[in-house]
């Protein structure tokens, strides 16, 4: 049913799931078919992200169980200081390495509308993912771009920003005011 709906409405924004919806608690499933349906989903996700003024969006946020997200950092009213990057479709992502250097930053989430959270995350990560053609890519990401990747990766693990903000390490770092070495 979901595939049929996408074929009928390419590039049409999809409804965004909000905290409390079951899809946001589920672990995403590996993408195995790199076909037009996947490309259409990515296109619709991008349209949803742009319409909502986001810098990233994960498939579970548009009610799809697939391990897929899009990052497209650009300055906008939600993130006026965001660096500009070309949209990047990330399929079946893995975080291979996380730096010990942590940094805190304000994050919002399209699935937790109207709220911002201070979140500590590794400043640099090394990642591996597939593109829309199924080819494996490797990248080292830093700063805000690394933050977007980790935020969207959380969605694929069934973790929303609300849950991330309540994790013990986040509370400890907030109390201390700095990461523990």
From Swiss-Prot:
One of its GO terms (molecular function) is peptide deformylase activity. Binds 1 Fe(2+) ion. Its cofactor is Fe(2+). Transmembrane segments: none annotated. The active site is at residue 152. Its EC number is 3.5.1.88. It catalyses: N-terminal N-formyl-L-methionyl-[peptide] + H2O = N-terminal L-methionyl-[peptide] + formate. Keywords: Hydrolase, Iron, Metal-binding, Protein biosynthesis. GO terms for biological process: co-translational protein modification; translation. Fe cation binds at residues 109, 151, 155. HAMAP family: Pep_deformylase. Belongs to the polypeptide deformylase family. This is Peptide deformylase 2. The gene is def2.
């Amino acid at each position: 049913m979901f595939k049929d709906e996408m074929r009928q409405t390419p590039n049409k924004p999809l409804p965004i799931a909000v905290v409390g919806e079951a899809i946001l608690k589920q672990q995403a499933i590996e993408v195995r078919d790199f076909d037009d349906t996947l490309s259409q989903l990515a296109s619709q996700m991008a349209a949803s992200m742009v319409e909502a003024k986001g810098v990233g969006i994960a498939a579970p946020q548009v009610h799809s169980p697939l391990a897929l997200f899009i990052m497209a950092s650009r300055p906008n009213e939600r993130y006026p200081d965001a660096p500009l990057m070309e949209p990047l479709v990330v399929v079946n992502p893995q975080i291979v390495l996380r730096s010990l250097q942590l940094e805190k930053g304000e994050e919002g989430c399209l699935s937790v509308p109207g709220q911002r959270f201070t979140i500590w995350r590794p400043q640099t990560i090394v990642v591996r993912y597939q593109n829309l053609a199924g080819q494996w890519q490797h990248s080292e990401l830093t700063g805000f771009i690394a933050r977007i990747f980790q935020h969207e990766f959380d969605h694929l693990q069934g973790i929303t920003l609300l849950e991330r903000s309540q994790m013990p390490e986040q509370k400890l770092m907030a109390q201390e005011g700095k990461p523990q070495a």
